[in-house]
């Protein structure tokens, strides 16, 4: 193992670990930075269940008490994000093996991690390895550093790849939500063992109105160390929305057409309201791509179930700040959080003279009822434990005045001044195109947003 004089780098720590120098003395995170996400706007892969699955047996060993664990840096040691990565799971579970608070996938010495492909594995199958190409689940065992053992052979963790991208699904469940007006969907992976579903998020969606009320998932302290450079995908219908061309509905051409029809004017007369720079509606992620750690998790965010029309100036402005600051807060206090991200209401579009304000939808049904509403508000609820939480809200209307915001968009008492970690939350009265933010108590918020689970009414403490 090579060492260099640049001893402060974390790369050197990996090499030191490979020669068994005590983990508790040298383990650190110097030089590592949480990645700032790019703007997320964009077809998922259809999910099929593989048949004829072969599972490699679990290998049991006795770990040496003084042997350090294998440490996989989620930002450096995983396969490149353009390569088809497997799922990284805790053995015989439906849970991802998530990184520790410093962003390392930590596997105890002698223990196994479960890797899952929906097709064949690359590199590890064939007559020379004794592993069938029908194998869909393998359980390599930690040796040291980033080196693992499988069927008697040694591999670097980056070598474990699938021959094709792991396929995920969006499944409609039998459960309803939003007071029985909407349907609960789950997003994730059907693992080949019967009954195992690895969920990345679940979604409360109104099929009739094409509105997602909320997306629920978990943030962990290691979420700030999400895998960087995962390619953005085109948003997918994920085998749903069969009656609609969702890409066309979100197109800027359709936005201008619907706005012109709404205000009874020509598209050319809407330059004050819509342009191609930042005054247009993007496919706004609810669960952000960067809220997910592994590439396989991040790709599941590119479904229209996890999107709503969001003004780009807000998407890349104040709302991006909310996403970043929440991840940073969770990392700082080293506690996991349940996260609900959703939308409320319908934004009203103004005429040029501001005398007319009408609800803005990107589609309509046969009876001209509005579908795919442009939300008035985006919100993110974070809950820690049973009773502590907070709601962060953002106004999705770059044309609203301060007066309109205070009278129409602030739907619960603003408590941001009571929360020290929200000191970054500021609004510039002269420039509200990036968005207007405020914060509320969870139990007060759900009184005006009944689509949320009733148990959130028990969250009565502010998350300080």
Question: Which role does the model predict for each range below?
Answer:
Residues 3-4, 10-464:
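Domain-level detector for secreted/extracellular nuclease and nuclease-toxin modules, and
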């Amino acid at each position: 193992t090579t060492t260099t004089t640049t001893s402060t780098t974390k790369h050197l720590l990996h090499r030191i670990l490979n020669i068994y120098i005590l983990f508790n003395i040298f383990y650190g995170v110097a030089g590592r930075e949480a990645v700032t996400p790019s703007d997320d706007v964009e077809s998922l892969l259809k999910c099929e269940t593989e048949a004829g699955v072969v599972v490699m047996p679990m290998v049991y060993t006795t770990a040496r008490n003084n042997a350090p664990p294998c440490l996989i840096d989620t930002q450096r040691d995983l396969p490149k994000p353009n390569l088809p990565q497997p799922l990284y799971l805790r053995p015989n579970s439906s849970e991802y093996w998530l990184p520790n608070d410093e962003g390392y996938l930590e596997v105890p010495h002698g223990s196994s991690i479960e890797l899952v492909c929906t097709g064949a594995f690359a590199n590890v199958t064939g007559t020379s390895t004794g592993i069938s190409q029908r194998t869909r689940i393998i359980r390599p065992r930690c040796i040291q550093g980033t080196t693992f053992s499988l069927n008697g052979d040694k591999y670097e963790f980056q070598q474990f790849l699938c021959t094709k991208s792991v396929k995920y699904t969006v499944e409609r469940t039998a459960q309803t939500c939003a007071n029985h007006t909407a349907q609960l969907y789950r997003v994730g992976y059907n693992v080949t063992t019967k009954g195992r579903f690895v969920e990345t998020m679940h979604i409360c969606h109104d099929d009739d109105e094409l509105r997602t009320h909320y997306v629920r998932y978990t943030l962990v302290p290691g979420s700030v160390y999400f895998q960087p450079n995962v390619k953005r995908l085109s948003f997918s219908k994920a085998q749903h929305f069969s009656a609609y061309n969702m890409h066309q509905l979100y197109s800027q051409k359709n936005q201008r057409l619907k706005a012109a029809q709404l205000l009874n004017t020509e598209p050319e007369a809407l330059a004050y309201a819509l342009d191609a720079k930042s005054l247009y509606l993007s496919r706004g992620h609810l669960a952000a791509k960067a809220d997910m750690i592994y590439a396989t998790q991040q790709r599941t965010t590119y479904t229209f179930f996890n999107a709503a029309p969001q003004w780009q100036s807000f998407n890349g402005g104040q709302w991006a700040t909310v996403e970043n600051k929440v991840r940073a807060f969770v990392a700082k206090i080293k506690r996991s959080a349940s996260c609900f991200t959703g939308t409320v209401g319908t934004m009203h579009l103004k005429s040029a003279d501001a005398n007319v304000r009408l609800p803005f939808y990107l589609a309509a049904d046969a009876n001209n009822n509005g579908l795919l509403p442009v939300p008035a508000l985006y919100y993110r609820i974070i809950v820690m434990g049973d009773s502590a939480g907070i709601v962060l809200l953002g106004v999705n209307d770059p044309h609203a005045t301060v007066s309109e915001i205070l009278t129409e968009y602030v739907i619960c008492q603003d408590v941001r001044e009571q929360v020290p970690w929200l000191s970054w939350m500021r609004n510039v009265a002269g420039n509200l195109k990036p968005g207007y933010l405020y914060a509320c108590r969870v139990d007060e918020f759900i009184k005006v947003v009944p689509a949320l689970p009733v148990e959130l009414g028990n969250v009565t403490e502010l998350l300080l």
